């Protein structure tokens, strides 16, 4: 957990970056996005981008039940995972332990606790986890091949490109859980992405520290996130 929480982190990521909310990428023509940006970083669902032409990918989602306990210390840790069928939830989160330690915990006589439940994804829900089985693995490969046919690139492919001219024609980059159909935690995505831009920070003629902030936001996605830049 970042110092000060995720709100502070997100505010820092978007500092000096124009941000618009309540904008549906799919309600606008692609040419409209091209008018305001040379390239798009797209973190929406890869199958939705192509209008589900090969079929829909499967997801798992989660729901939370949050309550206040009249106790300064409910479970002694921020997160306790449960794998037994005896429990309907997969983990219990006690939020104060993320930033409070030692005797500080007992200064507040109450504590906030959340139970996390894993459920099957249905339309209208927020997709959280890709389903790693034969059907979905084969299906996402078809979408990735289609993306390549349209000149779309993925973050791992940039590792092997040391000159901007080698991918100068690319105008869309897919990244994140939904666009890559891969599970990522915060630490994993930062570890994966930062070296890509340190190898050659002139790839996009943009300071790589800006890309660090951009890709650090590739983690917990809402429906999707689209970043538009003039380069």
Language model regions located:
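C-terminal catalytic lobe of FAD-dependent flavoproteins
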Residues: 129-211
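Conserved beta-strand termini and adjacent loop/short-helix elements that scaffold enzyme active sites
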Residues: 20-24, 95, 175
């Amino acid at each position: 957990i970042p110092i000060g929480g995720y709100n502070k982190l997100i505010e820092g990521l978007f500092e000096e970056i124009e941000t618009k909310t309540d904008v549906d990428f799919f309600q606008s023509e692609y040419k409209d996005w091209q008018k305001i940006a040379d390239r798009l970083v797209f973190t929406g669902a890869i199958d939705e981008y192509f209008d589900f032409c090969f079929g829909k990918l499967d997801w798992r989602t989660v729901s939370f039940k949050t309550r206040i306990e009249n106790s300064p210390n409910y479970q002694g840790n921020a997160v306790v995972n449960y794998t037994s069928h005896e429990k309907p939830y997969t983990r219990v989160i006690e939020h104060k332990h993320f930033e409070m330690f030692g005797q500080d915990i007992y200064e507040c006589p109450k504590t906030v606790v959340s139970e996390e439940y894993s459920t099957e994804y249905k339309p209208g829900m927020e997709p959280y986890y890709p389903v790693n089985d034969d059907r979905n693995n084969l299906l996402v490969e078809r979408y990735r091949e289609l993306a390549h046919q349209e000149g779309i690139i993925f973050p791992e492919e940039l590792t092997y490109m040391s000159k901007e001219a080698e991918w100068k024609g690319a105008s869309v980059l897919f990244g994140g859980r939904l666009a890559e159909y891969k599970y990522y935690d915060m630490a994993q995505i930062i570890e994966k992405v930062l070296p890509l831009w340190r190898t050659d920070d002139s790839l996009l003629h943009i300071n790589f520290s800006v890309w660090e902030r951009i890709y650090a936001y590739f983690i917990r996605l809402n429906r999707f996130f689209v970043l538009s830049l003039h380069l």
